[in-house]
Every structure is written in structure tokens, then in C-alpha cells.
């Protein structure tokens, strides 16, 4: 009887060990799938970054804007003068007219400076 209980205990212990080993292998395979997904996402992120860098360099190579004369600046000034000379508008003082011309020319120059970047030395 005592031998039978010991053999039953051994069988139970063996089954417990087998179940524990199977359970550990399942969690490892799940972890492997998670790690696989993580590596896949990392690869996609790296590929996206490389594509962004390539696109940025391609756009820099396509930039064809050249420094232009300030001829468009004179168009802005003439447009400002036309606005003040329209009938029905009150006569403005010379200071306001100069302020408008300065504002328009500063806006245009800032746009040119931003679009062209820093001048090369």
C-alpha cells in the first residue's frame, strides 16, 4: 500500500512537471510572437525614417528658387499707393503711407529670406 502511494505521488509529480514545462513553452512562444511583432514595427519605423531622409534630400536637390531682384517689392509699393489713391478714401498722411510701404516690404523680404534660407558666404 505504501509503495502504491509513492508511485502515485511520483506519477502526480511527473504530470505536474510536464504541465509546468508545457505552460512555460507556451508563454515563450507568445513572447516570441510579441518580440517578432516588435522587431517588425521597429523595422517599419527605420524604413519610414530612411524614406523621410531620402525624401528630404530629394526635395533639397529639387529646390530651384533663385534670388530675384526687388522688382516684386516695387509692385507691392505701387499696390499700396493705389489703395490710398482710390476715390472715397480719406487722404492719409505721408507717415501712414510710409508705414504701409515699410510693412509690406518687410513682409515680402521676410518671405524671401525664409524661402531661400541663409545666404551662402
From Swiss-Prot:
- Where mainly found? secreted
Its name, as the record gives it, is Parathyroid hormone 4
Signal peptide location in the record?
A: 1-24
Q: What causes induction of this gene? A: Up-regulated by runx2a.
Source superkingdom: Eukaryota
Report the gene name. pth4
Tell me the Gene Ontology biological-process terms attached to this UniProt entry: adenylate cyclase-activating G protein-coupled receptor signaling pathway; bone mineralization; neuropeptide signaling pathway; osteoblast development; regulation of bone mineralization; regulation of chondrocyte differentiation
Q: Which residues form the propeptide?
A: 25-29
Tissue localization of expression is: Specifically expressed in a bilateral cluster of neurons in the dorsal region of the periventricular hypothalamus. Their axons project through the midbrain and hindbrain and down the spinal cord.
GO CC annotations?
extracellular region
Region ranges (Disordered): 77-97
Pfam families xref list: Parathyroid
The record's subcellular locations are: Secreted
Q: What family does the database annotate? A: Belongs to the parathyroid hormone family.
* Entry GO MF terms: hormone activity; peptide hormone receptor binding
> Does the keyword field hold Signal?
yes
Task: Recite the UniProt keywords alphabetically.
Answer: Cleavage on pair of basic residues, Hormone, Neuropeptide, Secreted, Signal
Biological role:
Neuroendocrine peptide which is produced by a subset of neurons in the hypothalamus. Activates the G-protein coupled receptors pth1ra, pth1rb and pth2r with similar affinity. Receptor binding stimulates intracellular cAMP production. Plays a role in bone mineralization by regulating expression of factors involved in phosphate homeostasis. Important for embryonic bone development.
Amino acid at each position: 500500500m505504501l509503495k502504491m502511494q509513492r508511485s502515485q505521488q511520483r506519477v502526480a509529480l511527473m504530470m505536474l512537471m510536464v504541465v509546468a514545462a508545457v505552460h512555460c513553452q507556451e508563454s515563450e512562444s507568445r513572447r516570441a510572437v510579441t518580440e517578432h511583432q516588435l522587431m517588425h514595427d521597429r523595422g517599419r519605423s527605420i524604413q519610414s525614417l530612411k524614406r523621410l531622409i531620402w525624401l528630404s534630400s530629394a526635395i533639397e536637390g529639387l529646390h530651384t528658387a533663385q534670388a530675384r531682384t526687388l522688382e516684386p517689392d516695387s509692385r507691392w509699393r505701387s499696390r499700396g499707393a493705389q489703395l490710398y489713391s482710390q476715390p472715397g478714401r480719406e487722404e492719409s498722411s505721408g507717415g501712414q503711407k510710409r508705414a504701409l510701404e515699410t510693412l509690406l516690404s518687410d513682409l515680402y523680404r521676410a518671405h524671401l529670406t525664409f524661402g531661400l534660407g541663409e545666404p551662402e558666404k
